[in-house]
């Protein structure tokens, strides 16, 4: 099975601070996006890696010119950006892993598990079971509790057979929270593989320090 990856780095989110999109903020030995890219370009089972960029970023020095990296121009929505990346792999791979560039601490084990699941399933994605108590609330007040049984925190990379996820994105181009939702709308069954607590999505300013500590620990310093 030939496997490719699409790394989505076309967002403009600045909630994490710094005045520039979070994927281009400095982290460890490069940037947030660079750490994500290297997790896939350095993986033995991944054949082609596509980096989806915002059109304004393509002609800048923000993104790393990694050997063999394929660049795609993102669209007006996340779904359009993903589809642009998927099209770059059409005819090259059998399966694809779609990853948020803002998850720079993804592990080889998580990538391995998603690929392994795709050998027998059309779709697979990592997740971590919810263990905290869940409340509902309104106007700063607790209004109730929610049963956490069967609830998971979704992560990436989310993996699919390439033809199936391209068809799904064409059928359902808007409004999905992630690619698993797109796949399920199209009738695909999605296998859950174990996620990793370290596979955080950088969203808020404090997330950078945590990600830095994780990556430094892996390097042994």
Swiss-Prot record:
Instruction: Give me any GO biological process, just one.
Output: isopentenyl diphosphate biosynthetic process, methylerythritol 4-phosphate pathway
The molecule here is called: 2-C-methyl-D-erythritol 4-phosphate cytidylyltransferase
Among HAMAP family, the record links this protein to: IspD (MF_00108)
Site feature (Positions MEP for the nucleophilic attack) residues: 148, 201
Where does the chain cross the membrane?
none
The scientific name of the source species is Roseobacter denitrificans (strain ATCC 33942 / OCh 114)
For this UniProt record, give its keywords in alphabetical order, as a comma-separated list. Isoprene biosynthesis, Nucleotidyltransferase, Transferase
Q: In which pathway does it act?
A: Isoprenoid biosynthesis; isopentenyl diphosphate biosynthesis via DXP pathway; isopentenyl diphosphate from 1-deoxy-D-xylulose 5-phosphate: step 2/6
Q: Which GO terms describe its molecular function?
A: 2-C-methyl-D-erythritol 4-phosphate cytidylyltransferase activity
For the keyword GTP-binding, the answer is no
Note whether Plastid occurs among the keywords.
no
The record ties this protein, via InterPro entries, to:
IspD (IPR001228), IspD/TarI (IPR034683), IspD/TarI_cytidylyltransf_bact (IPR050088), ISPD_synthase_CS (IPR018294), Nucleotide-diphossugar_trans (IPR029044)
The reactions it catalyses are: 2-C-methyl-D-erythritol 4-phosphate + CTP + H(+) = 4-CDP-2-C-methyl-D-erythritol + diphosphate
Query: What is this protein's function?
Result: Catalyzes the formation of 4-diphosphocytidyl-2-C-methyl-D-erythritol from CTP and 2-C-methyl-D-erythritol 4-phosphate (MEP).
């Amino acid at each position: 099975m030939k496997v490719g990856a699409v790394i989505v780095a076309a967002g403009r989110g600045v909630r994490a601070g710094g005045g520039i999109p979070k994927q281009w903020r400095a982290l460890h030995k490069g940037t947030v996006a660079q750490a994500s890219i290297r997790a896939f370009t350095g993986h033995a089972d991944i054949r082609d890696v596509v980096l989806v960029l915002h059109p304004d970023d393509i002609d800048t020095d923000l993104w790393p010119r990694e050997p063999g990296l394929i660049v795609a121009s993102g669209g007006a929505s996340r779904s359009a950006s993903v589809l642009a990346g998927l099209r770059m792999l059409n005819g090259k791979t059998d399966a694809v892993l779609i990853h948020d560039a803002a998850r720079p601490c993804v592990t080889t084990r998580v990538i391995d598990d998603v690929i392994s699941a795709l050998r027998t399933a059309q779709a697979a994605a990592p997740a971590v079971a919810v263990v905290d108590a869940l409340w509902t609330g309104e106007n700063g007040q607790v209004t109730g509790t929610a049963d956490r049984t069967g609830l998971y925190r979704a992560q990436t990379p989310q993996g699919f057979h390439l033809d199936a996820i391209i068809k799904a994105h064409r059928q359902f181009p808007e409004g999905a929270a992630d690619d698993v939702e797109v796949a399920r709308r199209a009738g695909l069954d999605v296998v859950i593989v174990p996620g990793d607590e370290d596979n955080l999505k950088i969203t808020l300013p404090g997330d950078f320090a945590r990600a830095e500590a994780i990556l430094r620990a892996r390097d042994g310093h």
